[in-house]
Amino acid sequence: VRGKKVRAIADKIKENREELAKLETLDTGKTLEESYADMYDIHNVFMYFAGLADKDGGEIINTPIPNSESKVIKEPIGVVTQITPWNYPLLQASWKIAPALATGCSLVMKPSEITPLTTIRVFELMEEVGFPKGTINLILGAGSEVGDVMSGH
């Protein structure tokens, strides 16, 4: 189920890439061409982690101890807090959002106060996908106020 939801976000990003690229350009001042290229990278990040979400059954690791085995199991750790910088705002956010959701974690995201537009829009798209209430949480505000509270909690 997690993989399908994360894949659905990737699809929404692809469907809305022109709008997202324009917002990214408005936010950052980079060229529309560069912002448009970023949307392909962002789509691919979500697709990559969507694929991993379906493969979390565990992995056996060889050990030097006879008659023993070591198994790595990927489990949600709970709530992930994420603060992203102003440069490459949506790309850096995707590096945090996609793995958190793919592993079943809830997230609290605070984008840079000077470049929040694409992150706000992607959160709207994630709501359209239908993540359970409280799974995705967006906090806006100055880093000196909101970021300090989040990182000090």
Summary of predicted features, one role per range:
Residues 48, 58-153:
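Rossmann-like NAD(P) dinucleotide-binding subdomain of oxidoreductase/dehydrogenase enzymes
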Residues 1-56, 67:
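Glycine-rich loop-to-alpha-helix module at the N-terminal edge of alpha/beta enzyme cores
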